[in-house]
Amino acid sequence: MLDILSAIILGAVQGISEFLPISSSGHLVLVPALLGIETGLAFDTILHIGTLVAIFTFFWKDIINLIKGFILSIIDLTEGVDIFKRELHRVPEKRFAWLIIVGTIPTGIMGILLKDAIETIFRGTLFVGIFLLVTAAVLYYSERHSSGQITQKDMSFKQALIVGICQGLAVFPGISRSGSTIASGLCLGLNREYAARYSFLLSIPAVIGAGLIQIKDIATLDASASVLLAGFISSVIFGYLSIKLLMKMIKGWSLDIFAYYCTIIGIITIILSVVL
């Protein structure tokens, strides 16, 4: 059964690994296994909601612009305006809102179709280790193919769709959501800072969708309110700090440091899974 200290640790792990490209789903399998505790999907959902609050807190101005752009687009559509010919290029808020929508579509489809099967088949620590190595390879590759300067005004809907597909692959435990989206963005020619910003904002619909699907499981949580609150607050604080850290690092630091980390943890995880 969860206690407050374990909840704080897991909240910190979620907050850090959700935004740094090291796989939150993988770490939420590994850390409870090391601590000898069972959390379940319901507690994971509480932690994901905490990181969602962190995103809203850090990117609140961008989110307001996204909402504004979406509402204006809907108004245009009801008035018969062909937004895809003219308006999306003229109004940045509208264009960015639709870039997020287009990127969310494949993620949602993949999540609905694959999530249950993957969580059943690939939840073990051996698979986490294998997919952490995949994450490491993707990060390492992207650093050597990231010379683009594409920003919001230049990003195509095709590129948004590809990044959304890569985000959908994060249903595999050990595949980093932020890692796959930032890396795919870099390989597509996105500016480093914009690739990270788009990645974080693209995660909002995915986290909300996953939370709505799993909200029914929260009633099954065998933990006190204080334990849940501790995990939630911890994920918010560490999530916010991790976003701030990565947004600074992405400008001048290489993603190789995360690739090396995922490689080391992945190899150790595979060895322990086979030996123990």
From Swiss-Prot:
EC annotation from Swiss-Prot or TrEMBL: 3.6.1.27
Listed transmembrane segments: 40-60, 98-118, 121-141, 155-175, 200-220, 227-247, 255-275
Q: Which UniProt keywords apply?
A: Cell membrane, Hydrolase, Membrane, Transmembrane, Transmembrane helix
Q: Does the keyword Transmembrane apply?
A: yes
GO CC annotation:
plasma membrane
User: How does the entry describe its membrane topology?
Assistant: Multi-pass membrane protein
Could you tell me which HAMAP family the record lists for this protein? Undec_diphosphatase
The role this protein plays is:
Catalyzes the dephosphorylation of undecaprenyl diphosphate (UPP).
User: What is the protein name stated in its UniProt record?
Assistant: Undecaprenyl-diphosphatase
Write down the species: Methanosphaera stadtmanae (strain ATCC 43021 / DSM 3091 / JCM 11832 / MCB-3)
- Recite the lineage of the species: Archaea, Methanobacteriati, Methanobacteriota, Methanomada group, Methanobacteria
Name of the coding gene? uppP
